[in-house]
Every structure is written in C-alpha cells, then in structure tokens.
C-alpha cells in the first residue's frame, strides 16, 4: 500500500481513560498561611534589594571618614558586606547609634528603614518557622490519610509489601516520609496503571470496579526449569533443539538462536541472540528438528551419562523446553496437571496450584491476605529459583490491574476535542516515517532473492540479518539513521509498505484542563499532549481480560480496520516470562516465535514465506497459500526496546517511526534537551501551544547544583524561602514535575518516573534530594499542567481525580 499524503487521520477504536487512585487534594501539603508568609517575605526581599545599593554606597562613602575610629570602621565594613548580601548588619545598639551619628539625616533615614525592614523579615521568618513546624506534622497526617481511601492500602500492599508490613506508615522519619510522599504523589497525579494506584476504564462507560490478579509469569518458568532438571520429572516435558539455520551466502557454518530469561532492574524479558552455532551444531544434528520426549533426547545424546549431557545442553540453551501451556491456559495450573500423581516430583502439584490460587485470588483480598500471598509466592519462588544459572527470584511476584468505578465521559465524542485530536494528527503526520530498518530488510532481501523474489525460510533470513558477531553493524547503522532522520523525515514519511505492515498510526495520551466537563463541552479547556505510543492497540491489550467482551471486540475491529481484507495475526513476544506481555497476548490468532506458548490456531514462521513486491518495492509475509498476513505487535514493551531478530519482525509489522515533536514526553526529547543545557545556568523553555492544544509544557533545564536542596544547619524556613526565591527568579509555578536528564547513561532519564514537587514545601525538597539519581547532572522542571485544581473528573465524593486519556489515530492507506 502507498502511504497516504492526506495528513488528516481518523479516530479509531475505544478510548482508554486512566484515573488516579487517590484524589489530587491528597497533595494539599502547603497551607495558605505558608503561601502568604512566603509572599510577604518575597516582597520584603524585593524591598531590601531596592534599598541595598543606595545603603551600600552610603556605608562605602562613610568608611574613609572613619580613620579616627578604626574599630568602628571595621564594623562599618562588615555592615556594608551584610547589606550587600541583604542581611542585617552584625551591630549592637551602641554601634548602630555611633554609625547613625556619622550620617546625614537622609542617610540615617535610609539605615533606619533598612533595620526596620530587617526586623519585619525576622518576624516573618519566625512566623514561617512556627507555621512550617505545624505544617510538617500535618503533611505526614495528610499523606497518611490518603492511604485510607478505598482500596489504596491494598494497592500499596502490592506496590511496596515490605513497607506496608513493617513500617509505621504515619511516622515522621525521613525514610518513611519519602516513601509515603512518593507513592501518594504518584497515585494522585501520575496516571500510570498499577494495581489501584491508577485504575482504568473505557471512555463513555461507568466503571464496574472489576479487578484481576495473577502470579508473575516468571514463577512458572522457574518451576518449569526446576522440573526439567530433575530426573524424576524431566520425562513429563517435551524438548526441542534450539533453532539453527545455515549462515547463508558465502558465510560458512550455521547460526543458532539462543534464548534465555533475563532479569534486570525488576524487568524480565527473554534475551534472544543469534550467534554462530560452532560446536553446538554436532549436538543439534543429533537432536534433529522435531519435538522429542525425554527418552528420545537421552537416546540421541548417548554416552556414559546422557542425563548430564542433557543438563549441560539445557543450561547452554542448545536444548529448549517446549512450553506445556497454551496462551489461554494458566501456566502454574498446567504444570500442576503434569506432576499430578508423581510423588517424587521436586515441586508438588499442591504447591503449584496454591501458587496459582494465591495470585488469582489476590485481587479479592484485603491487606493481610495480599501480604500473605506475597509471603507464599516468595517462599515458592525462592525454592524454585536457580540464581547461579540466571534464574533469580523476580522482584515482582504479584500482578494486579483494577478498573475504575467512575463514570467516564466519552470525551472523543465532544466535537471540539475530536477536532483538536484530528488537527493534532495533521501536525504529526509529516513526522511519521518509514524506518531505515525496513530499508535494510529490503536491500538484503533483494540482494539474496532478487526483485519480486520469495524466501521460503523467513526465520533464516531474519536470523542472518541479526547475527551477533562484533555487534550488528548494519542493524546498528539503520537505527542510527532513524535517529538522524527524526529531525527532518522528508519524503520518508510517504514511502510505501506492504499488506503485512500497518499504515501510519499513533496512540495519543493526553489530559484535559478545565473546571468541569461542562466547560470541556463548551470548548473552554486545554488539551495537554503527554506522549505518543503505538497506534496498533498495544497500549490497550493489557486490559482486555479486565474490561470485557465489548472492549475486546472494539479493539479487534480497530486492528482489522488498519488492513482491510487482510487476515491479521498477533506477533507474540516474551509471554513466557514477562507478565505484562502475557496479559497483552491472545487477542488474535498468533504468529508464535521460538520459545513462546502457542494455541491451536497459531502458526510459526515455518508456515510462512517472505515475498517482495517489485512494483511497490515492499516486503510482505504470506502463508503457504500465498495469502498476505497482517502482522501486529500488541505487547506493552515498546518496539524500540525489542532486540535481535524480533526487532526486524516488529518493524515489518509496524515500520513507522513516530518522530513528531508534538508531545511533552521528556525521554523522546532527551538528545535535544541535553544539547540545550548550560553549566551553571537555568535555561527556560516556553510552553508550545496550538490553539487549545499544548504540545510542550513550559519547562526549565537546570543543573542539579542549582536546585534549592537542603543545606546542613539550615532551618525549614530558610530552606523554603530559598525554594520560593528560586521559583520566583525563574518564573516557575509553585507546583512542578522534575525529570532526570541523563547522567550515568543515556537511559537514566527513564529509570525513575517524574517527581511531583511543591516549591513551597521543605518536605518536597527533602524527597527531591533523595530522589535524584547519582551521576545526574541536569534535570528538566516542568509546569504541572493540568493544575491540580483543574482536573475535570470528580469522584463520588466530588473530589478531583487526575485523568489521562488514550485515543488512537490511523491514517488510512491511499486508494
């Protein structure tokens, strides 16, 4: 299909709304008296600043006239320095009287006013100190009270079980306050679905408060490998040699597809690598290409101790386990069925069923029940794990999603909102371009099979492109070319793709700022664009089981509408070990990759061919009858984070790079933002707005050394006055979000979510200090937009809730 040059998209599919799990007023940690005192002190400081220069001149001119009183001259010099620094001269009353006596009446009046303003400042500071002392205790109480909302503490028991279990949640200790502040602010103003800290619903519906939970997918993988390594249960499973293909071309030898579970920073994935088969090829020749029973494996391996060989090949990834569960099945329950009646099993069927039940029932439990579920799952995970062989205990053992109970308006049915999104799409479209990785596949395919050619073994083709020797030069170059093209895609935005590939699309994540939805309906609002994601539906599929049949069918219709007349299949990836990926799967008939669970209507790459259309110079995947396959990747893991041969497949499914600058996502702007940072300077960047649509919040790039963080020996009042002065000096609002900008490595900015900060709260400054990652030199400070008091969604108690909406835009193919 040719990419349409019509810039206006269409809205497609359901609209997903994320709802904050805690009302935004839970962050009312700064009282009005504090704001009034800070305003008073700011006015006093401004008055002192105006007085400072003339009074400094007065004292400077006085010094030469004090040769007759050296001691007084020294005191005047120290007083001059104090005035220059807007401080009270360090004089007693006698010194003040003696200095005044040496001045003219006008000069004395200036000094008297300085001392009077300084006294007013000292009085205001004392009041502020008292106010902050009360506010500190009230802050902890306010934050702690937020945990008492419906379902909040239950969600916290999943997010931070050890804190909920052991901490005094209302304690004013720095560590507890930091944890309390971080979670409450996240649930109140950062709409990122996690248990009940952010709930989800379908726009236009009233949420039913449904929930679902499960044990982590990695739990089943730990158990599976434990069973495979035991001679008492290895016979219950089926095995297969790792995929191997000829190196192709002039390259000798064979290539091996090696997969292993990897865990880092709490994220679990299957790390697939294409490498030279080397000495593994002799073993793979023995094993053959078919599925094998345990007895067949031992027979083919032979030797004095075939089981030892079996274990070595299993650990090396040369031999793989065929997953015994299907996509629609609960993995732990399926393993329990396998070991039923095997008394010598290293893991009992009862334990496997109990582990499944603990995860499956957790969403119905209160706090104690959830903590008990964590305890049970933790015991099982520790007994099944094998850290020495790269299978440690996962950080996240329990997964939960929750549906909102709110009535959610169909915001995209409001004509002005709909028109704003479509107009945004017009701005975006020239910045959506075909990836250079697609070009690489085209070039390599035509070189190997000729224009209009056919490849009967697509897996071999993708493996050859992704082989890892000293890096992967061509693939790395293509990714670098994509980065360079983001600034000016030009004609790349209009390059064609085949029927396997999706047309340009995007999911727009946005928020509305208005007093209420009546104002939105009248067109009196701001639409703030937070981020773009894949328009395939990948952001939505995680919630299909939660949100029900109608949501599912609308999502399927959306996917099918992107490729009319083409049978679509889902590219399944990492569902064996990554829980979120597993939750996203099973919407469409799958194209199953090696290492993935399957289902009866699944096909593999062995059931397909890759073909080139010489007329359009595009690639398509077809079945053995020659019918095109519409391929869609629906995983939560963004496709730019997928590596090895699977990266080529996700690019074939969706070849479009979204380089649109029309969202306020810090990580996407990181190279640009870092280039604009200046040592020792706070660099302001203005808000960018197109009518009602805000595509970039006002922000400030600041060295971490410039931030008003706590100082040793400083009182809370002195700290908060510095914070207030910092924000006023740079024109910042009181409430902001702080984002990391790089540091130790390129991805540091993505390691921690933005932190909500009140620049009128010493508690915020203390939390900010602990939040900053080591090695981060710069931060981006953004205005909090929408403001907390301008979220239009109200809960049943008429309290405001932060909401974020996700709507999908597609640009249909050119007719």
Each language-model region and where it sits:
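C-terminal structured domains
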Residues: 531-779, 783-784, 801-813
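Short polybasic amphipathic segments
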Residues: 254-262, 445, 516, 618-622
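Short amphipathic beta-strand/extended segments with alternating polar/hydrophobic composition
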Residues: 266-276, 457-458, 628-637
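Segments forming glycine/polar-rich beta-alpha architectures that bind adenosine-containing cofactors
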Residues: 229-234, 238-244, 438-452, 603-614, ...
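Surface-exposed recognition patches
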Residues: 260, 299-300, 304
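Short acidic, hydrophobic short linear motifs in intrinsically disordered regions
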Residues: 289-301
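Type-3 copper protein
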Residues: 1-214, 279, 286, 306-577, ...
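Acidic, low-complexity/disordered tracts enriched in E/D and polar residues
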Residues: 4-5, 9, 177-288
């Amino acid at each position: 299909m040719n990419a349409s040059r019509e810039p206006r998209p269409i809205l497609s599919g359901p609209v997903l709304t994320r709802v904050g799990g805690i009302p935004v007023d839970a962050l009312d940690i700064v009282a009005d008296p504090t704001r009034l005192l800070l305003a008073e002190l700011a006015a006093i400081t401004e008055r002192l600043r105006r007085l400072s220069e003339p009074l400094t001149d007065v004292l400077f001119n006085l010094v030469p006239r004090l040769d007759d009183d050296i001691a007084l001259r020294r005191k005047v010099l120290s007083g001059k320095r104090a005035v220059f620094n807007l401080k009270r001269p360090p004089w007693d009353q006698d010194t003040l009287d003696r200095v005044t006596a040496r001045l003219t009446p006008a000069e004395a009046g200036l000094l008297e006013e300085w001392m009077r303003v300084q006294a007013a400042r000292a009085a205001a500071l004392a009041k502020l100190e008292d106010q902050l002392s009360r506010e500190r205790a009230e802050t902890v109480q306010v934050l702690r009270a937020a945990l008492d909302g419906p379902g909040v503490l239950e969600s916290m028991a999943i997010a931070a079980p050890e804190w909920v279990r052991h901490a005094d949640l209302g304690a004013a200790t720095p560590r507890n306050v930091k944890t309390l502040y971080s979670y409450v602010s996240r649930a109140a103003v950062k709409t990122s679905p996690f248990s009940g800290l952010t709930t989800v619903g379908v726009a236009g519906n009233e949420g039913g408060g449904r929930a679902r939970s499960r044990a982590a997918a990695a739990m089943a993988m730990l158990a599976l490998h434990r069973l495979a390594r035991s001679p008492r249960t290895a016979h219950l499973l089926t095995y297969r040699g790792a995929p191997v293909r000829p190196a192709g071309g002039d390259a000798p030898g064979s290539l091996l597809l090696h997969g292993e579970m990897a865990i880092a920073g709490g994220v679990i994935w299957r790390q697939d690598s294409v490498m030279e088969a080397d000495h593994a090829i002799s073993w793979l020749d023995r094993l053959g290409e078919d599925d094998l029973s345990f007895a067949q494996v031992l027979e083919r391996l032979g030797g004095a101790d075939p089981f030892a060989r079996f274990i070595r090949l299993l650990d090396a990834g040369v031999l793989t386990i065929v997953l015994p569960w299907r996509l629609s099945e609960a993995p732990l329950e399926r393993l329990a069925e396998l070991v039923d009646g095997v008394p010598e099993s290293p893991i009992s069927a009862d334990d496997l069923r109990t582990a499944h039940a603990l995860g499956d029932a957790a969403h119905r439990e209160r706090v104690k029940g959830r903590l008990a579920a964590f305890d049970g799952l933790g015991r099982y995970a520790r007994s099944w794990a094998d850290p020495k062989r790269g299978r440690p205990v996962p950080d996240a053992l329990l997964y939960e999603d929750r549906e909102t109970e709110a009535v959610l308006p169909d915001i995209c049915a409001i004509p002005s909102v709909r028109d704003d999104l479509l107009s945004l799409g017009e701005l975006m479209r020239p910045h959506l371009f075909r990836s250079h990785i697609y070009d690489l596949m085209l070039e390599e395919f035509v070189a190997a099979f000729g224009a209009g050619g056919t490849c009967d073994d697509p897996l071999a083709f993708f493996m050859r492109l992704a082989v890892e020797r000293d890096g992967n030069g061509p693939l790395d170059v293509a990714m670098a070319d994509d980065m360079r093209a983001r600034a000016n895609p030009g004609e790349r935005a209009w390059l064609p793709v085949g029927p396997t590939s999706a047309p340009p699309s995007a999911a727009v994540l946005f928020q509305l700022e208005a007093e209420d939805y009546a104002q939105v309906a009248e067109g009196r609002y701001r639409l703030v664009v937070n981020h773009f994601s894949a328009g395939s539906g990948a952001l939505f599929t995680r919630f299909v089981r939660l949100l029900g049949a109608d949501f599912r069918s609308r999502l399927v219709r959306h996917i099918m509408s992107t490729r009319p007349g083409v049978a679509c299949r889902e590219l399944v990836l990492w569902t064996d070990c990554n829980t979120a990926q597993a939750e996203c799967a099973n919407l469409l008939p799958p194209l199953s990759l090696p290492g993935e669970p399957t289902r009866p209507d699944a096909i593999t790459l062995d059931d397909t061919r890759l073909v080139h259309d010489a007329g359009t110079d595009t690639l398509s995947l077809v079945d053995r009858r020659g019918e095109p396959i519409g391929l869609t990747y629906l995983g939560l893991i963004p496709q730019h984070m997928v590596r090895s041969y699977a990266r080529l497949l996700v690019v074939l499914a969706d070849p479009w790079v979204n380089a649109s600058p029309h969202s306020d996502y810090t990580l996407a702007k990181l190279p640009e933002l870092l280039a604009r940072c200046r040592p020792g300077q706070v660099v302001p960047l203005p808000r960018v707005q197109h009518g009602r649509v805000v595509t970039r919040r006002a922000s400030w790039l600041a060295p971490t050394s410039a931030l008003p963080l706590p100082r040793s020996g400083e009182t809370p009042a002195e700290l908060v006055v510095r914070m207030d002065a910092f924000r006023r000096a740079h024109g910042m609002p009181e409430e902001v979000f702080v984002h990391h900008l790089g540091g130790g490595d390129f991805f540091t900015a993505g390691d921690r979510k933005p932190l909500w900060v009140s620049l009128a709260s010493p508690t915020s400054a203390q939390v900010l200090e602990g939040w900053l990652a080591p090695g981060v030199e710069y931060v981006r400070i953004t205005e909090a937009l929408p403001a907390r008091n301008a979220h239009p969604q109200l809960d049943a108690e008429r309290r405001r809730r932060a909401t974020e909406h996700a709507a999908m835009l597609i640009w249909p193919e050119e007719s």
